[in-house]
């Protein structure tokens, strides 16, 4: 069985938690997942821990995950593999298998947090590298227009069907009770959607995502509310596509008899 090491990037924050997890998988040569920011001291620590590097994988293009890939590739000669061709030497797609360091990683497309988001499954070991689709603590932001709530929920369902034993997230601790955590993640998002619908149902006045977030996320730190409002917007756009809500100038109401607009 291969090894998994974590090198924590020095970019802590409200959304990155302790920082970005750079994962080193296998050995001689190792696979590096999400080099993180282009910070030489961090990337040198990755090389020191990895030894030889056979491939550099990106879960998605966001600035806390991908920029260090170019530096790491230049200093190791390893190819960068990503869903977006401009990010790497090779484009990888759902169902591809990447082998290095005694580990086979199956590529799983997981759009939602970002359109190019990938997860990587070591099927034999039961390891799932989730990027930002699932964090080790708290929940992930789904921020339109890149963030797509319908796609995100489908991705969570797909990961749950894989029945992994352990999750290695993009931020936060390793999750040992993987199926339970994935199920909780999925139910949490469904709960938030119900809360959005219920909040709209309490008034006939159209409401903005920020107004809804202030109610639904009451008690959350003020600095997190703008991101919460973006995730509420993602829920609203999904509900609008389903004909459950209507939108006028970024204000939303229930469609039909319960809302301010009737059909």
Predicted regions and their residues:
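C-terminal regulatory/interaction regions
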Residues: 199-263
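A short catalytic or substrate-binding loop motif that flags glycine-/basic-rich loops and adjacent residues
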Residues: 14-17, 111-114, 261-263
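Histidine-centered divalent metal-coordination motifs
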Residues: 59-65, 113, 171, 235
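Conserved beta-strand hairpin/beta-sheet module of binuclear metal-dependent hydrolase folds
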Residues: 1-49, 119-131, 136
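Metallo-beta-lactamase
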Residues: 30-32, 37-39, 104-111, 115-199
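Active-site HxH/HxHxD metal-binding segment of metal-dependent hydrolases
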Residues: 11-18, 37-106, 126
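Residue-level signal for inorganic ion chemistry
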Residues: 3, 46, 171, 196, ...
């Amino acid at each position: 069985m291969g090894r998994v090491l974590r090198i924590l990037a020095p970019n802590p924050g409200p959304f990155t938690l302790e920082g970005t997890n750079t994962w080193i998988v296998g050995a001689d040569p190792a696979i590096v997942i999400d080099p993180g920011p282009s910070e030489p001291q961090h990337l040198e620590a990755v090389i020191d821990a990895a030894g030889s590097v056979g491939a550099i994988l990106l879960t998605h293009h966001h600035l806390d995950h991908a920029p260090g890939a170019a530096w790491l590739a230049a200093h190791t000669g390893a190819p960068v593999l990503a869903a977006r061709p401009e990010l790497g030497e090779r484009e990888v797609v759902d169902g591809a298998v990447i082998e290095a360091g005694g580990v086979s990683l199956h590529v799983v497309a997981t759009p939602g947090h970002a359109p190019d988001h990938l997860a990587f499954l070591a099927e034999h070991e039961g390891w799932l590298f989730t990027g930002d689709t699932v964090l080790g603590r708290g929940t992930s932001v789904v921020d339109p227009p890149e963030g797509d709530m319908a796609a995100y929920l489908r991705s969570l369902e797909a990961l749950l069907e894989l029945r992994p034993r352990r999750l290695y997230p993009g931020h936060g601790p390793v999750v040992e009770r993987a199926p339970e955590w994935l199920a909780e993640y999925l139910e949490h998002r469904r709960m938030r959607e119900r809360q959005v619908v219920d909040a709209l149902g309490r008034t006939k006045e159209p409401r903005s995502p920020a107004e809804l977030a202030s109610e639904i996320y009451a008690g959350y730190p003020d600095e997190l509310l703008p991101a919460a409002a973006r995730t509420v917007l993602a829920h609203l756009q999904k509900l609008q596509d389903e004909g459950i809500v209507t939108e006028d100038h970024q204000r939303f109401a229930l469609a039909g008899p319960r809302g301010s607009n009737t059909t």
